[in-house]
Amino acid sequence: MNFNVIIPARYASTRFPGKPLVEINGKPMVQHVYDRAIESGASNVIVATDDARIAKAVSDFGGKYCMTGAHHESGTERLAEVVEMQDMLSQEIVVNVQGDEPFIPAENIQQVAENLHHHQQAEMATLAVKIVDVEEAFNPNAVKVVLDKQGYAMYFTRATIPYDRARFLDEDIIDEIGDYYLRHVGIYAYRAGFIKQYVNMSPSGLEQIESLEQLRVLWHGEKIHVDIARKTPPAGIDTPEDLKRILADPSLKF
């Protein structure tokens, strides 16, 4: 199975400007992401950026990049521009790996591509991990997903779902949660033709309320298949403090 990986990488981050170029063990962050994509077995890896400094860094380590417009409001829109520039066929699989995920397991990238390949009814695929911590179940920054019996997403939300009526009504016994709680892992595989359709879909009210762009797909009646990640990835890096915390984790290898 062949698949592409596109890595959207922006320099202008409000909380962490220049994040893709921050050095980790002597290499810029974007290179670590690129290396994980290569290790996944992807046949084509491209960094999509609107910044010449990032493009130069990618060129310096021998990577491939595409310069995109600076007007995009989401990484998916940036992907769509690259799909057009590369003349990708409509059935080609494209995996979107965020440029601030230097520690993402290569296995997860391969898994999400395989997930889409094996589910022809879906236009998108993604991953999730089980939530075992009560605090995470109630954390709005941890995006939850509920699935149907075939593994297709029914809804993504920042709220706590499903709501365990018997347990949650009594705050004194919220010490454990059941088996239905899943945290969404922000990696997506798309069919190239669908990416071009997606950017022309009207945004949904639910997407805007939750600030979750994948809800646009469900709103318009398309399917997203969700697989349980074989490896739980560490959190992404949004701030310098996140980077310090993750680098202090002795379990991470470079």
From Swiss-Prot:
The keyword Nucleotidyltransferase applies. One of its GO terms (biological process) is CMP-keto-3-deoxy-D-manno-octulosonic acid biosynthetic process. SUPFAM superfamilies: Nucleotide-diphospho-sugar transferases. GO terms for molecular function: 3-deoxy-manno-octulosonate cytidylyltransferase activity. Its main location: cytoplasm. GO terms for cellular component: cytosol. The keyword Methyltransferase does not apply. Its EC number is 2.7.7.38. It is found in: Cytoplasm. It is an enzyme of class 2 (transferase). It catalyses: 3-deoxy-alpha-D-manno-oct-2-ulosonate + CTP = CMP-3-deoxy-beta-D-manno-octulosonate + diphosphate. Pathway: Nucleotide-sugar biosynthesis; CMP-3-deoxy-D-manno-octulosonate biosynthesis; CMP-3-deoxy-D-manno-octulosonate from 3-deoxy-D-manno-octulosonate and CTP: step 1/1; Bacterial outer membrane biogenesis; lipopolysaccharide biosynthesis. It holds the Pfam family CTP_transf_3. InterPro entries: Cytidylyl_trans (IPR003329), KdsB (IPR004528), Nucleotide-diphossugar_trans (IPR029044). Keywords: Cytoplasm, Lipopolysaccharide biosynthesis, Nucleotidyltransferase, Transferase. Belongs to the KdsB family. Activates KDO (a required 8-carbon sugar) for incorporation into bacterial lipopolysaccharide in Gram-negative bacteria. This is 3-deoxy-manno-octulosonate cytidylyltransferase.
